[in-house]
Every structure is written in C-alpha cells, then in structure tokens.
Swiss-Prot record:
Protein name: UPF0358 protein Sca_0738
HAMAP family, per database record: UPF0358
InterPro entries according to UniProt: UPF0358 (IPR009983), UPF0358_sf (IPR036270)
Superkingdom: Bacteria
Taxonomy of the source species: Bacteria, Bacillati, Bacillota, Bacilli, Bacillales
SS bonds (residue pairs): none
Family that this chain belongs to: Belongs to the UPF0358 family.
Pfam families attached to this UniProt entry: DUF1507
Length: 91
C-alpha cells in the first residue's frame, strides 16, 4: 500500500512539474520571443497543453491519480497562463 501511494505521489508530482515547465516556457517566450497573438506562440501553447492533458489522462486511466486531481492541475495551469497573458497584454 505504501508503494502504491509513493507511485501515485510521484505521478502527481511529475504532472505538476510538467505543468510548471509549460508555464516557465510560456513566460520565457512572452518575455523574449513573441506576442501572445503570434501563431507560433499559440501553436506551442496548444501543443504543450494537449500533451499535458494526455499525460493526465494516461495517469488517471492507470489509476495513478484521481481524475479530479488531474483536472485541478489543468485548471491551475490555465489560470496561471491567463494571468500571465493578461499581465503581458496590459503592459
């Protein structure tokens, strides 16, 4: 049972790290490369979000995380990206 909890925690931690990596990637891109309206920016964001959603679905299907935990990860990232986008466009 302890090993299962350890694996579940590791899966949840990894998904959070991946979400943070996406957020950091977008921060760097917004600071240095392109505007949020740029098709390249949108393509990178869409691709990264799609990939993370697939990771979440995979972990949930294997029973490594609860689907609600996965939804929370995605919602947190979407909220952070929205704040970042607002801050960048209101400058």
């Amino acid at each position: 049972m302890a090993k299962t909890n350890s694996i579940n925690n590791a899966a949840y931690d990894q998904l959070n790290k991946d979400a943070d990596r996406i957020l950091q990637l977008i921060k760097v891109q917004m600071d240095n490369l392109t505007l949020p309206q740029c098709p390249l920016y949108e393509e990178v964001l869409d691709t990264q979000m799609f990939g993370l959603q697939k990771e979440v679905d995979f972990a949930a299907n294997l029973g490594l995380i609860d689907i609600e935990m996965g939804k929370e990860i995605m919602l947190r990232l979407e909220k952070e990206l929205s704040k970042l986008h607002e801050a960048f466009t209101n400058v």
